[in-house]
Each structure stands twice: as structure tokens, then as C-alpha cells.
């Protein structure tokens, strides 16, 4: 059962006020991916959890302000609310475990950089924004990305200060 609309509306607004386009139906998801064949896009799987509120959504805002390199489009689906749209989105992420919050940077219709929940939990928005900026600068341009362009955040910068017993709930 989806979360109540009135509960998630402020969480949606945190991204839409930044110009992130919402995809609420499977048809909207398919149309976005059809259009993405020749461009770059950042897909955000939004969530009600604390790490989305404190880290993921603020990281999008910080990353947008931190660089001149940007994906052609910023898109989002809301896990726990837009259930069918989220399910369809995950079909485009075959082989990548489902998690939320979540980021995937696509280039020419293919995911080239992924930030899973386990890369968000325990890390602050500034660090996550740096990860996104690094990906934007590598993949969002006319030039081919470098051979050593990252595909995920550097695990050595994940979860600094967390106890060794910490387990992500992904």
C-alpha cells in the first residue's frame, strides 16, 4: 500500500523545486527512457527514509550548484508511493539490486554510474554530492568518458565514522 500523498508531497517538492521531473506512471518512465537514448540523465529513486531526507535529496541540490557539468535531464520516481512507476524504472536497472534512495546516471540509455542506499547511509550530503559531481564531470559532456571513469562511489569514502558492526538495510 502506498504512503499517503500528503505525507510525501513535501519530500517530492524538495526535488521538483530543483527542476527534477517526476515520473509517476510506467508510461512516463518508458517515454523518459526512450528519449534518453541520445542524452544523459540522472534518475533519483526518492524515498521517505531519513537518509533520503538528510543526505540524498540535499546531495542533488548541492551537486547541481557545484559544477557546470550536468546531465541533460534530472528525473525521479518515488518508491513507496508511485509503485508501478518505480517497478518499471527498476526494469531498466537489470542486474542492479533495488534500493531507495538511489541514483543512477545514464548515458545513451545505459546506466554508467550508480549510487545505492549503502553508498548513502552514513555519508553526508556533501560527500554524496562530490560523488555525483565526479560522475557528471566524467559522463556529462560531448567527449567520451575516460577509461577509468568511476561507476560507483569510492568505497573507501563510504560510511566514515560508522562502527564496524554497521549493516546497510538495502
Swiss-Prot record:
InterPro entries: BrxB/BrxA. GO terms for biological process: cell redox homeostasis. Residues 140-170 are annotated as: Disordered. Belongs to the bacilliredoxin family. This is Bacilliredoxin SRU_1493. It comes from Salinibacter ruber (strain DSM 13855 / M31). The lineage of its organism: Bacteria, Pseudomonadati, Rhodothermota, Rhodothermia, Rhodothermales.
Amino acid at each position: 500500500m502506498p504512503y499517503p500523498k500528503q505525507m510525501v508531497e513535501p519530500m517530492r517538492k524538495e526535488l521538483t523545486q530543483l527542476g527534477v521531473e517526476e515520473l509517476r506512471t510506467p508510461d512516463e518512465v518508458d517515454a523518459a527512457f526512450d528519449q534518453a537514448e541520445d542524452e544523459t540523465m540522472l534518475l533519483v529513486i526518492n524515498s521517505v527514509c531519513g537518509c533520503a531526507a538528510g543526505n540524498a535529496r540535499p546531495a542533488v541540490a548541492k551537486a547541481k550548484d557545484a559544477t557546470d557539468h550536468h546531465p541533460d535531464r534530472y528525473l525521479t520516481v518515488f518508491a513507496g508511493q508511485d509503485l508501478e512507476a518505480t517497478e518499471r524504472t527498476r526494469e531498466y536497472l537489470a542486474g542492479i539490486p533495488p534500493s531507495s534512495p538511489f541514483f543512477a546516471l545514464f548515458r545513451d540509455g545505459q546506466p554508467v554510474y550508480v549510487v545505492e542506499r549503502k553508498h548513502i547511509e552514513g555519508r553526508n550530503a556533501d560527500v554524496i554530492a562530490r560523488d555525483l559531481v565526479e560522475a557528471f564531470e566524467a559522463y556529462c559532456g560531448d567527449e567520451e568518458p575516460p577509461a577509468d571513469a568511476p561507476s560507483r562511489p569510492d568505497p573507501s569514502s563510504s560510511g566514515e565514522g560508522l562502527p564496524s558492526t554497521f549493516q546497510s538495510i538495502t
